[in-house]
Design a protein with these regions (language model features):
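Active-site substrate-recognition segment that forms the wall
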Residues: 1-119
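C-terminal lid/capping helical subdomain adjacent to the catalytic/cofactor pocket in oxidative enzymes
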Residues: 116-166
Protein backbone atom coordinates (compact mmCIF):
# COMPACT_ATOMS: atom_id res chain seq x y z
CA UNK A 1 0.00 0.00 0.00
CA UNK A 2 2.88 2.32 0.74
CA UNK A 3 3.68 2.63 -2.96
CA UNK A 4 0.33 4.32 -3.57
CA UNK A 5 0.27 6.78 -0.67
CA UNK A 6 2.10 10.08 -0.42
CA UNK A 7 3.60 9.26 3.00
CA UNK A 8 3.97 6.52 5.56
CA UNK A 9 0.81 6.23 7.61
CA UNK A 10 1.43 3.04 9.54
CA UNK A 11 4.04 1.48 11.75
CA UNK A 12 5.00 -2.17 11.33
CA UNK A 13 5.12 -4.14 14.57
CA UNK A 14 6.67 -7.56 15.21
CA UNK A 15 4.65 -9.74 17.57
CA UNK A 16 5.10 -13.12 19.25
CA UNK A 17 2.83 -15.87 20.55
CA UNK A 18 2.89 -19.44 21.78
CA UNK A 19 0.45 -22.24 22.50
CA UNK A 20 0.75 -24.84 25.23
CA UNK A 21 0.13 -28.54 25.26
CA UNK A 22 -3.40 -29.30 26.55
CA UNK A 23 -3.92 -28.57 30.25
CA UNK A 24 -6.44 -30.30 32.52
CA UNK A 25 -9.49 -27.99 32.80
CA UNK A 26 -9.35 -28.18 36.61
CA UNK A 27 -5.99 -26.40 36.46
CA UNK A 28 -7.26 -23.41 34.45
CA UNK A 29 -8.42 -20.09 35.89
CA UNK A 30 -12.15 -19.42 36.55
CA UNK A 31 -14.30 -18.79 33.49
CA UNK A 32 -11.20 -19.16 31.30
CA UNK A 33 -11.62 -15.50 30.35
CA UNK A 34 -9.24 -13.54 28.16
CA UNK A 35 -6.55 -11.87 30.24
CA UNK A 36 -4.94 -8.67 28.97
CA UNK A 37 -2.10 -7.07 30.89
CA UNK A 38 -1.73 -3.49 29.69
CA UNK A 39 1.94 -3.08 30.60
CA UNK A 40 4.42 -2.17 27.87
CA UNK A 41 4.88 -4.49 26.14
CA UNK A 42 1.39 -5.89 26.71
CA UNK A 43 0.64 -9.53 27.46
CA UNK A 44 -2.48 -11.49 26.59
CA UNK A 45 -3.50 -14.96 27.68
CA UNK A 46 -6.48 -17.02 26.59
CA UNK A 47 -7.54 -20.63 26.32
CA UNK A 48 -8.68 -22.70 23.36
CA UNK A 49 -11.49 -25.25 23.17
CA UNK A 50 -8.98 -28.05 23.65
CA UNK A 51 -7.73 -26.56 26.93
CA UNK A 52 -4.56 -25.18 25.44
CA UNK A 53 -3.27 -21.81 26.57
CA UNK A 54 -2.25 -19.10 24.11
CA UNK A 55 0.14 -16.45 25.39
CA UNK A 56 1.13 -13.50 23.24
CA UNK A 57 2.72 -10.09 23.20
CA UNK A 58 6.29 -8.85 23.52
CA UNK A 59 5.72 -6.64 20.48
CA UNK A 60 8.50 -4.48 19.10
CA UNK A 61 8.36 -1.70 16.53
CA UNK A 62 10.37 -3.08 13.64
CA UNK A 63 9.59 -5.08 10.51
CA UNK A 64 12.77 -6.97 9.59
CA UNK A 65 11.55 -10.58 9.15
CA UNK A 66 15.00 -12.07 9.75
CA UNK A 67 15.50 -10.13 12.98
CA UNK A 68 11.93 -10.91 14.08
CA UNK A 69 12.35 -14.63 13.46
CA UNK A 70 15.76 -14.70 15.16
CA UNK A 71 14.13 -13.34 18.34
CA UNK A 72 11.43 -16.03 18.46
CA UNK A 73 13.16 -18.34 20.96
CA UNK A 74 14.09 -15.47 23.30
CA UNK A 75 10.58 -13.99 23.15
CA UNK A 76 9.04 -17.43 23.76
CA UNK A 77 11.08 -17.79 26.95
CA UNK A 78 9.97 -14.32 28.11
CA UNK A 79 6.29 -15.13 27.44
CA UNK A 80 6.61 -18.45 29.28
CA UNK A 81 8.22 -16.69 32.28
CA UNK A 82 5.48 -14.06 32.40
CA UNK A 83 2.80 -16.74 32.28
CA UNK A 84 4.42 -18.76 35.06
CA UNK A 85 4.74 -15.64 37.20
CA UNK A 86 0.97 -15.10 36.96
CA UNK A 87 -0.02 -18.78 37.19
CA UNK A 88 2.71 -20.71 39.02
CA UNK A 89 0.39 -23.63 39.80
CA UNK A 90 -0.68 -24.36 36.20
CA UNK A 91 1.43 -27.07 34.55
CA UNK A 92 2.55 -25.36 31.37
CA UNK A 93 4.63 -26.60 28.47
CA UNK A 94 4.91 -24.79 25.13
CA UNK A 95 4.02 -26.92 22.13
CA UNK A 96 4.51 -24.32 19.40
CA UNK A 97 5.52 -20.67 19.06
CA UNK A 98 5.28 -18.23 16.17
CA UNK A 99 5.79 -14.61 15.25
CA UNK A 100 4.47 -12.21 12.69
CA UNK A 101 4.15 -8.60 11.64
CA UNK A 102 1.12 -6.35 11.79
CA UNK A 103 0.54 -2.69 11.06
CA UNK A 104 -0.92 -0.04 13.29
CA UNK A 105 -1.81 3.63 12.91
CA UNK A 106 -1.18 6.64 15.15
CA UNK A 107 -4.83 6.93 16.16
CA UNK A 108 -5.44 3.19 16.50
CA UNK A 109 -8.00 3.01 13.70
CA UNK A 110 -7.47 1.24 10.38
CA UNK A 111 -7.69 2.93 7.01
CA UNK A 112 -10.69 1.68 5.05
CA UNK A 113 -11.87 3.03 1.71
CA UNK A 114 -10.56 4.53 -1.50
CA UNK A 115 -6.93 5.34 -1.93
CA UNK A 116 -6.58 9.13 -2.25
CA UNK A 117 -6.73 10.18 -5.92
CA UNK A 118 -7.48 6.61 -7.05
CA UNK A 119 -11.23 6.02 -7.02
CA UNK A 120 -10.96 2.40 -8.16
CA UNK A 121 -8.36 1.36 -5.58
CA UNK A 122 -9.49 0.35 -2.10
CA UNK A 123 -7.54 -0.37 1.05
CA UNK A 124 -8.49 -2.03 4.30
CA UNK A 125 -5.35 -1.96 6.44
CA UNK A 126 -3.68 -0.92 9.68
CA UNK A 127 -5.79 -3.01 12.06
CA UNK A 128 -3.33 -3.14 14.93
CA UNK A 129 -4.28 -6.10 17.07
CA UNK A 130 -7.95 -5.93 16.09
CA UNK A 131 -7.90 -7.60 12.69
CA UNK A 132 -10.94 -9.82 13.18
CA UNK A 133 -13.19 -6.89 14.02
CA UNK A 134 -11.81 -4.28 11.64
CA UNK A 135 -11.47 -6.60 8.64
CA UNK A 136 -15.17 -7.43 8.90
CA UNK A 137 -16.13 -3.76 9.16
CA UNK A 138 -13.81 -2.97 6.25
CA UNK A 139 -15.34 -5.67 4.07
CA UNK A 140 -18.82 -4.30 4.77
CA UNK A 141 -17.83 -0.70 4.03
CA UNK A 142 -16.02 -1.55 0.78
CA UNK A 143 -18.78 -3.92 -0.37
CA UNK A 144 -21.36 -1.15 0.07
CA UNK A 145 -19.10 1.36 -1.67
CA UNK A 146 -18.79 -0.95 -4.68
CA UNK A 147 -22.60 -1.13 -4.78
CA UNK A 148 -22.85 2.67 -4.70
CA UNK A 149 -24.20 2.70 -1.14
CA UNK A 150 -22.76 5.11 1.44
CA UNK A 151 -21.76 3.61 4.79
CA UNK A 152 -21.39 6.33 7.42
CA UNK A 153 -18.67 4.30 9.17
CA UNK A 154 -16.47 5.01 6.17
CA UNK A 155 -15.99 8.56 7.42
CA UNK A 156 -14.51 7.27 10.68
CA UNK A 157 -11.94 5.11 8.91
CA UNK A 158 -11.30 7.22 5.81
CA UNK A 159 -8.02 8.59 4.51
CA UNK A 160 -9.21 12.15 5.10
CA UNK A 161 -7.83 11.94 8.64
CA UNK A 162 -4.27 11.60 7.30
CA UNK A 163 -3.92 15.39 7.27
CA UNK A 164 -5.14 15.59 10.87
CA UNK A 165 -2.77 13.04 12.40
CA UNK A 166 0.15 12.71 10.05
Amino acid sequence: AGKFLSREIMDLISTYALVSHPVDSKDLWPEQCLIWETAEPYLYIRTTRGNRIIVGGEDEKFSDPERRDALLRKKTLVLEKKFRRLFPSIPFKTEMAWCGTFSTTKDGLPFIGNCPDKDRMFFDLGYGGNGITFSMIGAQIICKKLQGIDDERGRIFGYERIEKYW
